[in-house]
Regions:
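Short, conserved SAM-binding/catalytic segment
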Residues: 14-23, 235-249
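Core catalytic lobe of class I
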Residues: 1-9, 13-232
Length: 249
């Protein structure tokens, strides 16, 4: 079941991710994250996986307030609301559950410190994605990894076998979003920190990859996306995706 909620819906009700644990549900909201997240019931989310926007100038390889940024990726706006965002995350996340936030080397320390005020920050996971990069090709080393902050709300138990914090997963072709992540990477996070039927939340849904991973793994999904083109893409992908059975050690 996929439920869509648009910005000017006069019949809005509180989001209740406790609806069904046998057959997963999918609720997609085309709204501003900071407005939509307030509708989510407290202690109703089992896992948060998200890649918040941050500013980057692709032509020069550094942040700039005057240059054109990646569409929908205004890091200077998002930083103002990090405290508010973390406060809401801590409200909706169940006790003994986990949160994973993608970030980058230059904004990682800021996010880590902010998250530490609300969660128990556990690890910096390094996603080694391989390949080349963009920006200053002569003056910079190739940027071939991303940081993921893993934190918990209480004593969270990881599933399956214990493993290291460097994950070597090839990056995917950018078909649906400017900062698209491989489905395999999101699936790995979901399998390590949730069980079938649990509710996964992504407030910056982008092209819908987290929803695709949830569909493959029999998890319920609540996703928010403000940019209309991204929302349409994500909704279409999730609706038309045929789940693929995955086996994880």
């Amino acid at each position: 079941m996929i439920e869509e909620q648009k910005p000017n819906n006069s019949t809005e009700t509180a989001i209740s991710p406790m609806q069904c644990y046998v057959q997963p549900f999918f609720r997609l909201l085309h709204k501003d994250c900071f407005l939509a997240i307030r509708e989510i019931e407290s202690n109703s989310i089992d896992l948060i996986v998200t890649d918040p926007p941050y500013g980057i100038n692709l032509s020069k390889g550094y942040k700039s307030g005057s240059e054109e940024l990646v569409k929908g990726d205004d890091g200077f706006t998002i930083m103002v609301f990090v405290d508010e965002l973390m406060q809401e995350f801590s409200r909706i996340l169940k006790l003994n559950s986990a949160i994973y936030v993608f970030t980058r080397f230059d904004v990682y320390p800021y996010w880590w410190l902010k998250m530490k005020n609300y969660f128990e920050t556990k690890n910096q996971i390094i996603w080694s994605k391989g390949g080349g990069g963009v920006g200053d090709l002569q003056g910079n080393y190739i940027h071939n990894y991303e940081s993921i902050i893993y934190a918990t709300n209480g004593k969270h138990k990881l599933r399956n076998k214990r493993e290291g914090s460097v994950w070597q997963i090839p990056k995917c072709k950018l078909e649906f979003h400017e900062t698209e992540k491989p489905v395999e990477l999101i699936e790995k996070i979901i399998v390590k920190s949730s069980d079938e039927g649990m509710v996964v939340f992504d407030p910056f849904m982008g092209g819908g990859t987290t929803g695709i991973a949830c569909k493959n793994l029999n998890r319920s999904f609540v996703g928010i996306e403000m940019i209309e083109t991204n929302f349409i893409t994500a909704k279409s992908r999730i609706e038309n995706h045929c789940p693929q059975i995955r086996v994880f050690p």
